[in-house]
Amino acid sequence: MSQLDSNWSFVDDSKVTPKGFLFAGISAGLKASNKKDLALILAPEGSVFSGMFTQSIVRATCVDICQERIKKTSGFVRAILINSGQANACTGNLGIQHFQIATGKIAELLGIKEEEVLMCSTGVIGVPIQINDLVKNLPNLVSDLKGNNFENAAEAILTTDLTLKKVSIETIIQGRKIKIAGFAKGSGMIYPNMATMLAFLTCDAGIQKEEWDKMIAIAVQKSFNAISVDGETSTNDSFVGINAGEKIEKRFFPIIQQGIDIVCQNLAKNIARDGEGANCLLEVLVQGAKNTDDAIMLAKSICNSALVKTAIHGCDPNWGRIISAAGNSGVKFNLNDVDLYIGNAQILENGKLNKYDPQKVTDYIKSRMKGRYLVDDIVKIMLNLNSGESKGTAWGCDLSKKYVEINSEYTT
C-alpha cells in the first residue's frame, strides 16, 4: 500500500475491490489472438449507475441503448457486459439484435431484468459482433465472476493497448473502509471530450443518483475530457461509474469526490501515456487563468497540437509551437502577461523571450523519453497567464513514426 495523501491510499486490486462487486474476464474467441475479449461487472442490488458517452453524432448501437437503459431504470442497473474485438458500430439493425441477444442471455443467467444490463463494445468499426461465439461463452463468463477477478476484466477490454490500465484506492471514513476501483482501455483515437476509450469505476459508498451524476461529471471533465493522443473521436466512448453500499453522509462527499478524481486522472494519464507509438507523457499545466474551464481548454489545445507533439518527439524545444497552440485555443489572454516553462526552464517572462539554454531543454526532453513508465517519463509544460487564480491540466503524448505505422496497418 502506498500513500496518496491524507485521505486515500493505493491498494492491491487482486485482493481489495469495492465490497459486493464481482468481475470476470475470459477469452470467447472474438479476437484472432485468442486473448481475453469478454468482461463482465456485476454490481450489488440497489447500485446506482451514471454514464457519460461519446459526443460524436456517429454512435455505436451500445452507446444509444445504454443511455436509454440508464434513463429508463433511473440508474438502477446491475451488470455491464463488455466485448473487445468488434465495435458493433455502423452495423444497423443487426447490431441492435446482437446487443439484445447478448444482454438478454446475460440477464437470464444472472436472474435479473434485461433492462438492468448494459453492454459496451470496442474494436473495429463496421464489423458485427461474433454473436455465436459470444453467447456460447456467456455461461463461462458468469461462472468466472469473483471479487478478485478485477485484473481479468481489465485485460479483456483491451485492443491496441500495450499496458493494463487499472487502479484501486481506499480510505477510512468513520471507521468504515471505502474503496474505489477503476479500469480502462484506450491507446489511439483519443481526443478531449471522450474518445475511443472505455472506462469503468466502482465504489462501495452509497450515494444518491443526482449527487453521483454530479461527481462523475466533475471527475470526467478533469480527466478523460482532458487527454489527447491524436485528435480523433470515436463512436463507442463510454465511461460508467457505479456505486453501491451503505449510504455515506453528505459532509463526506468531498472526500469521495477526491477519490473519484484520483482514479479517473490516474486512468486518463495511463491512456495518454499508452498512446500508439508514444515514448512519453506530455503534461500541460495552465495557471493564472480567469476560470478552470479556460485553463483546461487552453491546456488541451497545446496537448492536441500535432506540431507540439512532434516537437516533443524530436526533443526540439520549439516553444513557438506551444504559444501558437495556446493562441488557437479560443481562450482570451494577454501575451504580455504570459510566463512559459518547459521543465524547470523559463522560456518566456511577461511574453518576452527569457535567457535559457536550449540544449538543456533538449536534454530534459530526451531524459523523459527514456524515463520509467509514468514515473520520470513526463514532459512538463507550464503556462502562467497571470490573469486570474484558476488552473487546469491536460495530458497527451509525443507523436511518432510508429503511430503512423500502427494505424496504416490496423484495419479500421
Language-model features: locations:
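A structural signal for small-residue-enriched, beta-sheet-centric alpha/beta enzyme cores
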Residues: 2-83, 88-97, 107-412
